[in-house]
From Swiss-Prot:
PANTHER family: LYSOPHOSPHOLIPID ACYLTRANSFERASE 2, PORCUPINE. The active site is at residues 341, 372. It comes from Rattus norvegicus (Rat). It is a multi-pass membrane protein. It is an enzyme of class 2 (transferase). Partially inhibited by thimerosal. This is Membrane-bound glycerophospholipid O-acyltransferase 2.
C-alpha cells in the first residue's frame, strides 16, 4: 500500500492506494493538473485585456497559496514567513545592502528548513516536501533583491547588458511581490522567471515586448497575441511519455544496483559502464515530467512567449527549464549543463558567477550544493563537478580544433565525446542520487576513482589554453553553462529596457507601496 505520510491533505488517499504511489506525489501531480486547468481559465477569463492587473495578482496569489496548503499543510506557512521577512529586510536594509542581507537570510532560512526535514523527519527519502517550493522562492527572493540593487543603486555603466535589462527601477508592492513568489503557476515546481518578465505578463505587455525584441520593427506590435495551445499540447505529450517511462522502466534500473556487491564483483568494465549510463538515463524522466509540466502550466496561462523563430513559428521557451534532445545528445560537459535546469543555471550565473571576485566556478558549484540541500552526496557531486568541468574545458581547448575537418573526423570525434560525456555525467551525479556519503564512496571505490584521477592528470599535464578573448572580459570569464544565455539575456534586456520608462512613470501612489522581490 502507498504510504500515508504527508503534511498536506489526505483527501486523495484512496487514489494514492489505487495507483500505489505515495500520497505526497499524488497530491503534487493532481495539484499541477488542477493548476493547468486553472491556467487555461486564467488566460481565457482573466486575460489582461479583460481585467485589471490587481485582480490577476490577487487570483494568481490565492490559487497558489491554496495549492501550497493542499500539498504541504501548515508547512506552507514557511513560504509566507520566508517571503515576508525578506520583504521587510528589503525595506529596512535599503537598496545599498538589501541584496546581501536577503541572500544570507533567504538561503539560511532554506538551509535550516532542509536540515530540519532531512535529519529530523525524513532522511534519505525522495518526497514532494515543502523545501522544494522553497528552493524556487529562494531563487526569486535573491534574484529580485539583486535586480532592485542593480536598478536603484548601481550606475548603468557598472552593469552588464543582461543586468541592465533585468534591473528593477522601483520597489514592488507587497501584492506584486507575493504574486511573484507564490503564484499558482510556479508555486510547486517553478520554474524561475525574472520579476520583470512576470510583471510584463500580468500587465499584458509580454507579447509586445517579445515581438518587438525579435528585430526591433514597429510593425511587429500589430501581430495578434499567439496561442500557446500547440506548445502546451506538445509539452503535455512529453510529460505523458516521461511519466510512462518513469513508471515502467525506471524502477527496473535502480541506480543503487551500481553499488551492489555481487554486481561489482562479477560485472565486467563494459557492463559496469553500460549499466551506469542506462540507470542514470532512467533516473532523468521524473525531472523531465515535473519541469515540462511546470512549463506547460505557465504557457497555458499565457506566460513564456519569447517571440518568433526565423520561420515565423511562435516560441514558448522563455522560462523552459530543459532541452531533452540536447541533453541526451550532449557531446561535452558544457553542452549538458547548458541544457539541464536552465533557469537555475541562469540564477547561479546572475547572483554568483558574474559577481564573484575570485574562483567563480568553485563558488558557483558550492552555492549550487548549498541550495540543493544538506545531503553529503550533493556536495560530493558538485565537488566532482568542479573537477570534471575544469578538466573537460582543458581537453576541449587543447584538442577540439584538430577534429573540425573533415566531416568524417568530426563525426568520429562527436561519437567519442558523446560516450565520454554521458559516462562522465553519470559518474559525477551518482552521489546526488544515492544521497549518503558511504554508498557514494562505495561507488567511487568500485571505479577506483578513475575519472577523478584522469581529471587531475589532465589539469596537471595539459597546457592552459583559453578560448579566444571577447571584447568584454567579463563575458570571457563566464562558465560553460552561462555563455549560451548571453544572446538571449541581452535581447530580453533590451526588450525590458525599452519598457523601462513605462514602468518608472506609473503613478506615485502605486509606486509608494512598492518594496521588494525575487528572480
Amino acid at each position: 500500500m502507498a504510504t500515508t505520510s504527508t503534511t498536506g491533505s489526505t483527501l486523495l488517499q484512496p487514489l494514492s492506494n489505487a495507483v500505489q504511489l505515495p500520497i505526497d506525489q499524488v497530491n503534487f501531480v493532481v495539484c499541477q493538473l488542477f493548476a493547468l486547468l486553472a491556467a487555461v481559465w486564467f488566460r481565457t477569463y482573466l486575460h489582461s485585456s479583460k481585467t485589471s492587473s490587481f485582480i490577476r495578482h490577487v487570483v494568481a496569489t490565492l490559487l497558489g497559496l491554496y495549492l501550497a496548503f493542499f500539498c504541504f499543510g501548515w508547512y506552507a506557512l514557511h513560504f509566507l514567513v520566508q517571503s515576508g521577512i525578506s520583504y521587510c529586510i528589503m525595506i529596512i536594509a535599503g537598496v545599498e545592502s538589501m541584496h546581501q542581507c536577503c541572500f544570507v537570510f533567504a538561503l539560511g532560512y532554506l538551509s535550516v528548513c532542509q536540515i530540519t526535514r532531512v535529519y529530523i523527519f525524513d532522511y534519505g527519502q525522495y518526497s514532494a516536501d515543502f523545501s522544494g517550493p522553497m528552493m524556487i522562492i529562494t531563487q526569486k527572493i535573491t534574484s529580485l533583491a539583486y535586480e532592485i540593487h542593480d536598478g536603484m543603486f548601481r550606475k548603468d555603466e557598472e552593469l552588464t547588458p543582461s543586468q541592465r535589462g533585468l534591473a528593477v527601477r522601483r520597489m514592488p508592492s507587497l501584492l506584486e511581490y507575493v504574486s511573484y513568489t507564490c503564484n499558482f503557476m510556479g508555486i510547486l515546481a517553478g520554474p524561475l522567471c525574472s520579476y520583470k518578465d512576470y510583471i510584463a505578463f500580468i500587465e499584458g505587455r509580454a507579447s509586445h515586448m517579445a515581438q518587438s525584441g525579435e528585430n526591433g520593427k514597429e510593425e511587429q506590435h500589430g501581430k495578434a497575441e499567439p496561442s500557446p495551445n500547440a506548445a502546451v499540447t506538445e509539452k503535455l505529450l512529453v510529460c505523458g511519455l516521461s511519466l510512462l517511462f518513469h513508471l515502467t522502466i525506471s524502477s527496473m534500473l535502480p541506480v543503487e544496483y551500481n553499488i551492489d556487491e555481487h554486481f561489482q564483483a562479477t560485472a565486467s568494465w563494459p557492463t559496469k559502464a553500460t549499466y551506469l549510463y542506462v540507470s542514470l538515463l532512467a533516473a532523468r524522466p521524473k525531472y523531465y515530467f515535473a519541469w515540462t509540466l511546470a512549463d506547460a502550466i505557465n504557457n497555458a496561462a499565457g506566460f513564456g512567449f519569447r517571440g518568433y523563430d526565423k520561420n515565423g513559428v511562435a516560441r514558448w521557451d522563455l522560462i523552459s527549464n530543459l532541452r531533452i534532445q540536447q541533453i541526451e545528445m550532449s557531446t561535452s560537459f558544457k553542452m549538458f549543463l547548458d541544457n539541464w535546469n536552465i533557469q537555475t543555471a541562469l540564477w547561479l550565473k546572475r547572483v554568483c558567477y558574474e559577481r564573484a571576485t575570485f574562483s567563480p566556478t568553485v563558488q558557483t558549484f558550492f552555492l549550487s550544493a548549498i541550495w540543493h540541500g544538506v545531503y553529503p552526496g550533493y556536495y560530493l557531486t558538485f565537488l566532482t563537478g568542479v573537477l570534471m568541468t575544469l578538466a573537460a574545458r582543458a581537453v576541449r581547448n587543447n584538442f577540439r580544433h584538430y577534429f573540425v575537418e573533415p566531416p568524417q573526423l568530426k563525426l568520429f570525434y562527436d561519437i567519442i565525446t558523446w560516450a565520454a560525456t554521458q559516462i562522465t555525467i553519470s559518474y559525477t551525479v551518482v552521489p546526488f542520487v544515492l544521497l549518503s556519503i558511504n554508498p557514494s564512496f562505495t561507488f567511487y571505490r568500485s571505479w577506483y576513482y578513475c575519472l577523478h584521477i584522469c581529471s587531475i592528470l589532465v589539469l596537471l599535464l595539459l597546457p592552459v589554453k583559453k578560448s579566444p578573448r571577447k571584447k568584454n572580459t567579463e563575458e570571457n570569464a563566464q562558465p560553460s553553462w552561462a555563455k549560451k544565455f548571453d544572446e538571449r539575456e541581452n535581447s530580453l534586456g533590451q526588450n525590458s529596457f525599452s519598457m523601462m520608462n513605462n514602468v518608472c512613470n506609473q503613478n506615485q501612489d502605486t509606486g509608494s507601496r512598492h518594496s521588494a522581490l525575487t528572480q
